[in-house]
Amino acid sequence: MVSCIGTDHAPHTPEDKANGAAGMVGLETAFAVCYTKLCRECGLPLEHVSALMSAGPAAVMNLPTKGLVAPGFDADLVLVDIDHMFTVDAAKLHSKSKNCPYDGQSFYGKVMLTLKAGKETFRSPEFAG
């Protein structure tokens, strides 16, 4: 049974990758890949995938104030437009690395806004809220 989905987000410079460093960019595409593949294509409920990507990792990492939207928890939120399809362009990723295996692939689930402890950390130019 799968209890969580996470990414170690291992960005490396092109030089590091040329020397065999393991890892890839994953943070910016993680939700869209999981939502498209698991929810849209395999039929898993969004609520289940959301829990696997929030409460699940918080439990595994023993982070008692993370993973839920509830009193006493940190206000860490991600707002997503699940109907927004986009094509990954590795050159436009915010990471220091551009080694993304999803470059050129299309996914649903565009992240529009992120909050960490209630403070805005990312806002898509396409977010109208």
List PLM regions with ranges.
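C-terminal cap of metal-dependent C-N hydrolases
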Residues: A22, P71-E126
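His/Asp/Glu-enriched, well-ordered alpha-helical/loop segment
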Residues: S3-I5, H9-I82
